[in-house]
Amino acid sequence: KAEHVVLRSRYSVLRLKKNKSLISRLLFEGAEKFQVKVYNNSLNSNHIHLLVKAPSQKNLHDFLRFLAGQIAQRITGAVRGKKNRFSFWLKPVWRRIVHWGRDFVNLHRYIYQNQLETLGLIAYQLRDRKPHLFERAF
């Protein structure tokens, strides 16, 4: 099944010119390496939305570890295995299963809306939604 994945950074640095191309390259490099189909993505200043499908949970897990780890290391200059004083990512990766049909189409629209808002082509629109259980804990 397809999944909606959100990676949220502690810092608003993901859309900086030098980081945009790096993240796009890592996204598609990881997708190819771990056989993950990326249906849609939105790179925002402090978070990334992905609509993806993987052949197995292991592939998706490995892809997300690769992507999150490489982005954090490349942007902060952190070295793997060396303790850092801070975490680049604000929260753990958020995921939910996306059902085919209306759910899939609505998520495509939502990610597209994020892309347009990020580019400044449309005004930011407040989301009227209930917080997820994950968000209530913080």
Task: Pin down the residues of each PLM region.
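Short catalytic/metal-binding and nucleic-acid-binding patches
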Residues: 1-138
